[in-house]
Amino acid sequence: MAQRITLHDMTLRDGMHPKRHQISLEQMKGIARGLDAAGVPLIEVTHGDGLGGASVNYGFPAHSDEEYLRAVLGELKQARVSALLLPGIGTVDHLRMAHEIGVQTIRVATHCTEADVSEQHIGMARKLGMDTVGFLMMAHMAPVQTLVQQALLMESYGANCLYITDSAGHMLPHDVTEKLTAVRQALRPETELGFHGHHNLAMGVANSLAAITCGATRIDAAAAGLGAGAGNTPMEVLVAVCERMGIETGVDVFRIADVAEDLVVPIMDHPIRIDRDALTLGYAGVYSSFLLFAKRAEAKYRIPAREILVELGRQRLVGGQEDMIEDTAITLARARGLPVA
């Protein structure tokens, strides 16, 4: 029997990062219709930093989470909608709102060593009867045994699926194999395993295939790779490769390629590719959504973005510390005698 996986689209959530959270409702509805028609079963919709992400730190979106979610939910014929929630950014009130308007899957995301902060949110989601996913970010930063312990914590809180997340696009296939094999062996058989990759070292597809080989049944990807850094695993490429390998996705390769080419590429503010800064993200192991913040700091303080990113990697900054990026740029500028006023 052919192996079957669930592809989870990131275009309308992780894709908000390179769009500075400014995707219009009409653009979002059009892309959602295309994804739905292509057979994508699960589509994530929120601010790039999850429910409640609208802020000075993370950026103000063109519309509220509720407006985006309602717009997409009204367009779908077969796909389900998920929302991301980072404790400390999103609250249980945001979670209840998403559930009340029809979101069926919630993904509760923490840094890979901080699963304990997810207990309230995972517990509430399970109480509401939602498909509840624990999402361990920046997984390259934790040794295997730590990752296993954190995954087991999320499972004990009620998560029915655990994601290992390569937020920096830093992992290589052997890293994925080592970590996902250990987590898969530790989880209950009925608990699903997922993988979220970034393409900063061009490993998105290869890492996803490694994850599938280890027993992952949910894989994140984005049409045309639209996402932070050099983007997420490109959905259309992953679908084509899976089809060649006999892995069933339920997604039509030509329809998803058309969504990427006709709907997603035209709205890009800049090409999603492995430029020197995105490469630095993957090489240094820095959170992918830091890229635009580093580029803004470069323009303001005349410190090359990649030098800022390398320093962030040295400091081991993690998601949620975006406010430290400007501080780092100021420190580097002062060290060189550059004006910071």
Curated annotation (Swiss-Prot):
Mn(2+) binds at D14, H196, H198. Belongs to the 4-hydroxy-2-oxovalerate aldolase family. It catalyses: (S)-4-hydroxy-2-oxopentanoate = acetaldehyde + pyruvate. Keywords: Aromatic hydrocarbons catabolism, Lyase, Manganese, Metal-binding. Its EC number is 4.1.3.39. NCBIfam families: 4OH_2_O_val_ald (TIGR03217), PRK08195.1 (NF006049). The active site is at H17. The record marks R13 as: Transition state stabilizer. The keyword Transcription regulation does not apply. This is 4-hydroxy-2-oxovalerate aldolase. Substrate binds at R13, D14, S167, H196, Y287. Signal peptide: none annotated. InterPro entries: 2-IPM_HCS-like, 4OH_2_O-val_aldolase, Aldolase_TIM, DmpG_comm, DRE_TIM_HOA, PYR_CT. GO terms for biological process: catabolic process; L-leucine biosynthetic process. GO terms for molecular function: 2-isopropylmalate synthase activity; 4-hydroxy-2-oxovalerate aldolase activity; manganese ion binding. Residues 5-257 form the Pyruvate carboxyltransferase domain. Coiled coil: none annotated. The keyword Lyase applies.
